[in-house]
């Protein structure tokens, strides 16, 4: 090869390597805790938001997710153990694989007969949220009334009872009424009963972009580290093994169990796996360029929030309305409201992880509190707290207190036309 061509080839290879190693602008570097996604326990909350002296809280609308729980089913642990036991029988399991097998056996045993149940951590989360609400708004609980409803799911029912029992412990003069069951599904489980959404979900319109992302993003290396034979698993099988491994391990903090995820995944691998789960939540639980149906299922719930606030102003409602549902209850609602950080429109789904983060939006025990205040002039304003942190309601505004009529007009416009009062 002539010398000048060799030099050009070396230079080209050098710049090609620079290009290949350049930072991916869509890559994330979230912490291991954050990469647990919706399994992350509720964040610590120690600081109360100062309320101006001119405002008096008169009503609270609360929509909450159940607290931390055991894994919802045995599916992921079963798949991990099936793969690892087969590899072990073939003499192809690494020390890391044996360690994972032992850990997965422990998770399965710990969850036996408790799949999906609220655990002690989840109970404590609900009691903590209730206690902070009580301390922040003591006047509302002085001979006040509390109305609570929940999904029929046992973990939601138990979350409601832990919350309301804590309020009763703090002040047993509070009048409490609770309701659970399928009659609450239109508000708490609309993903089960709204026909348009159920049909859209079954159409699997969302599946092609998700599968494409998963197949190009989910790593195979973690599975290769579990098994000595590099040919034991195909790439597609390895991705599925890693996915089930990730689901088992990332769910452990919600069980109150500590786990060092860095023993099984690099930071890059963990972020890649989380981004796949995050994208699936985004595609099937929020408004996207594919469809608005996932957000529209929360229309009845949003209308209920508007109507109960109106009724409170008219003196026809309880002091506090509590609702206990699921992450799948909150994600559509927050998207429908276009709440900051909870709504993102794009045709580039590889950017979703930068702008829409499930661990910020719906950790275990996630909640939206809509607090109505009366001003010293007799007017009303409202503040929205996501996970007990105030968030602006209106686009292009950082104000956290919004006049009720202005907030009401905005929320009504979020509803489909046939539901707008």
Locations of regions flagged by a protein language model:
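Signature for phosphate-centric chemistry
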Residues: 23-147, 151-321, 325-421
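Bacterial Sec-dependent N-terminal signal peptides
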Residues: 1-25
């Amino acid at each position: 090869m002539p010398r000048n061509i060799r030099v050009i080839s070396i230079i080209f290879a050098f710049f090609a390597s620079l290009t290949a190693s350049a930072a991916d602008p869509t890559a994330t570097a979230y912490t291991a805790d954050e990469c647990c996604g919706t399994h992350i326990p509720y964040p610590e909350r120690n600081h109360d938001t100062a309320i101006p002296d001119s405002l008096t809280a008169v009503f609270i609308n609360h929509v909450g997710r159940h607290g931390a729980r055991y894994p919802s089913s045995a599916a992921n642990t079963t798949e991990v153990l099936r793969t690892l036991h087969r590899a072990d029988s073939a003499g192809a399991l690494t020390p890391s694989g044996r360690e994972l097998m032992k850990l997965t056996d422990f998770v399965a045993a710990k969850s036996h007969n408790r799949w999906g149940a609220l655990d002690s951590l989840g109970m404590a989360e609900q009691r903590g949220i209730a206690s902070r609400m009580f301390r922040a708004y003591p006047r509302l609980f002085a001979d006040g009334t509390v109305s609570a409803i929940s999904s029929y799911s046992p973990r939601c029912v138990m979350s409601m009872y832990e919350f309301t029992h804590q309020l009763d412990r703090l002040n047993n003069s509070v009048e409490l009424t609770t309701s659970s069951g399928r009659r609450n599904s239109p508000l708490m489980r609309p993903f089960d009963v709204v026909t348009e959404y159920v049909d859209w979900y079954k159409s699997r319109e969302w599946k092609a972009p998700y599968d494409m992302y998963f197949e190009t993003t989910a790593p195979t290396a973690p599975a290769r580290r579990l098994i000595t034979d590099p040919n034991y698993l195909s790439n597609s099988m390895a991705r599925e093994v890693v996915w089930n491994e990730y689901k088992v391990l990332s769910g452990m903090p919600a069980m109150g169990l500590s786990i060092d995820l860095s023993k099984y995944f690099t930071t890059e691998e963990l972020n890649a796996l989380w981004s796949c789960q995050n994208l699936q939540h985004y595609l099937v639980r929020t408004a996207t360029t594919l469809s608005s149906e996932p957000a529209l299922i929360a229309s009845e719930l949003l209308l209920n929030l508007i109507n109960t606030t109106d009724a409170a102003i008219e003196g026809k409602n309880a002091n506090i309305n509590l609702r206990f549902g699921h992450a799948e209850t909150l994600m559509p609602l927050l998207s429908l409201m276009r709440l900051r950080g909870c709504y993102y429109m794009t045709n580039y789904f590889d950017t979703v992880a930068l702008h829409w983060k499930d661990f910020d939006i719906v950790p275990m025990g996630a909640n939206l509190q809509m607090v109505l205040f009366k001003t010293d002039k007799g007017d009303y304003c409202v503040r929205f707290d996501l996970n007990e942190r105030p968030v602006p309601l209106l686009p292009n505004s950082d104000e956290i207190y919004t006049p009720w009529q202005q907030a009401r007009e905005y929320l009504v416009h979020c509803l489909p036309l046939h539901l707008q009062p």
